[in-house]
């Protein structure tokens, strides 16, 4: 074997395979593996491109990489980042691929090409050079180094901010509806800050996700007798019955004016109770509402009204009726 491959101190790599870390650490294994092209033993380098990435290693020897001007790991062109076949077809390069039958013939061909590294492999046209220049990848895609087996979602991104940014090995997307119920430990969401299901991070994510993807509108209370909606933080200019009535009629077009039975204004607290004729009308309006909405240029808050407390006299009458 030639001394070129045996005494190699650094591999021939593209920037994507090398990774963004300037203080990378590599392991060197002389004659550790056979080249996948010429079958000769060569020095294998192994390293980790960055935190959360897969370990990479060289797959072909330096001679084959220099002959084809490719990366020893991804086998893509060092200048354009394209496969060898695409590059050669675009540039019109007709290079001898060498023998493919015998391992000895492959090794002999590699030794011969090693002595001719300084010679040109072929000629290329200006049109071909312009074509591969346009097809070249302008930006380094470090996402290729992310773990293939990790399909988990990032919980920090679901909360609204992930400090790791593009270097995060987990998916930056919100879960679908079938991933939300329960948020069990076996769900497809990664929680990097705490492993327990009762941790604050998991509870925060569950609260945010369920609040953002829950059913639209205000959930109706269990008490079927409640037919009113409560509005607070009303602006003074809209603290009038016609303004509030028109707000609900515009919000829910199926509603009619007679469907709103009455509106009780509490001017001292800038709030109001909107009483509907039936429970169905109240639920129709509630489905179009959100806990926080805007009326004019100010934010208002909406919620269902509460049940009336049962008076003591009514309680006594009910008890007497039960005794009788």
From Swiss-Prot:
Q: Which organism is it from?
A: Mycosarcoma maydis (Corn smut fungus)
Assigned protein family = Belongs to the SLT11 family.
Which keywords annotate this record? Answer: Metal-binding, mRNA processing, mRNA splicing, Nucleus, RNA-binding, Spliceosome, Zinc, Zinc-finger
Zinc-finger ranges (C3H1-type): 149-175
Q: Which gene encodes it?
A: SLT11
Name the record gives this protein = Pre-mRNA-splicing factor SLT11
**All residue ranges annotated as the RRM domain in the record:** 227-317
- What GO molecular function annotations does the UniProt record carry, in alphabetical order? pre-mRNA binding; U6 snRNA binding; zinc ion binding
Q: Which InterPro entries match?
A: Cwc2/Slt11, Nucleotide-bd_a/b_plait_sf, RBD_domain_sf, RRM_dom, STL11/RBM22-like_N, Torus, Znf_CCCH, Znf_CCCH_sf
User: Which proteins does it associate with, and in what oligomeric form?
Assistant: Associated with the spliceosome.
């Amino acid at each position: 074997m030639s001394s070129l491959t045996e005494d190699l101190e650094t591999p021939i790599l593209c920037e994507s395979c090398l990774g963004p870390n300037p203080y990378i650490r590599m392991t060197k294994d002389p004659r550790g593996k056979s080249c996948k092209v010429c079958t000769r033993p060569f020095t294998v380098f192994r390293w980790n491109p960055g935190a959360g990435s897969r370990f990479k290693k060289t797959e072909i020897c330096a001679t084959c990489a220099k002959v084809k001007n490719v990366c020893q790991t991804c086998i893509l062109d060092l200048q354009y980042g394209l496969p060898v076949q695409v590059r050669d077809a675009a540039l019109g390069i007709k290079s001898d691929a060498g023998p493919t039958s015998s391992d000895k013939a492959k090794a002999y061909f590699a030794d011969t090409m090693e002595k001719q590294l300084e010679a040109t492999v072929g000629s290329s046209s200006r049109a071909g050079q312009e074509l591969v220049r346009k097809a070249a990848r302008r930006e380094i895609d470090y996402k290729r180094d992310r773990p293939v087996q990790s399909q988990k979602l990032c919980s920090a991104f679901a909360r609204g901010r992930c400090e790791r940014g593009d270097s995060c090995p987990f998916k930056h997307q919100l879960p679908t509806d079938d991933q939300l119920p329960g948020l069990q430990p076996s769900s497809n969401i990664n929680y990097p800050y705490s492993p327990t299901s009762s941790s604050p991070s998991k509870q925060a994510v569950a609260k945010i996700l369920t609040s953002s993807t829950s059913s639209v509108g205000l959930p109706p209370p269990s008490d079927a007798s409640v037919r009113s909606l409560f509005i607070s933080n009303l602006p003074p200019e809209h603290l009038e019955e016609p303004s509030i009535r028109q707000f609900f009629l515009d919000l829910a077009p199926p509603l009619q004016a007679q469907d709103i039975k009455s509106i009780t204004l509490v001017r001292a607290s800038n709030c109001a109770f909107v009483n509907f004729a039936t429970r169905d009308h109240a639920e129709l309006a509630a489905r179009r509402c959100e806990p926080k909405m805007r009326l004019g240029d100010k934010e208002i808050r909406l919620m269902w009204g509460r049940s009336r407390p049962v008076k003591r006299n009514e309680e006594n009458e009910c008890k007497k009726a039960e005794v009788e």
